[in-house]
C-alpha cells in the first residue's frame, strides 16, 4: 500500500511547507512518489521511510494512520521523530566516523529497505524544521 506525506502549515493545511518557508530544506532529496515530491517541497514518498521510523521507535510511531479524513501527524510527534532520527544519526557518526553521504547506514529488519546517511539526515532535517515552524504532516494512502 502506498503512502505519500505532505508537510503543510499547521494553521493552513492547504498551504505546502516548502523551501520558500525555510531555506534549510532547499537541498533535501528524499524518495518521491507519483503524487509527491522529493522533500524540498514538503512532500515525499512516506512508504519508503515509514519502516525506518517504525523500527527506530520500536513500533511507537507510524505514518499509516487509521483515519478516513484529515489524517495528519501533529507537530509534537514530528519533533519526537526528528529527535529520534538525530540520536540515531549521532550514534552512526560516533561509531563509524567519516562517512560518505551515499553510504548505507541502516537496513530494515526484513531487508526491504535501506537508507543512506544523506537520507537519514534529510528526513531528520525536514521533520525538525517542520516541527520548529509548527507545521504538521498530512498522510495519504
Predicted regions and their residues:
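Acidic (Asp/Glu-rich) sequence patches and key acidic residues
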Residues: 1-125, 129-133, 137-141
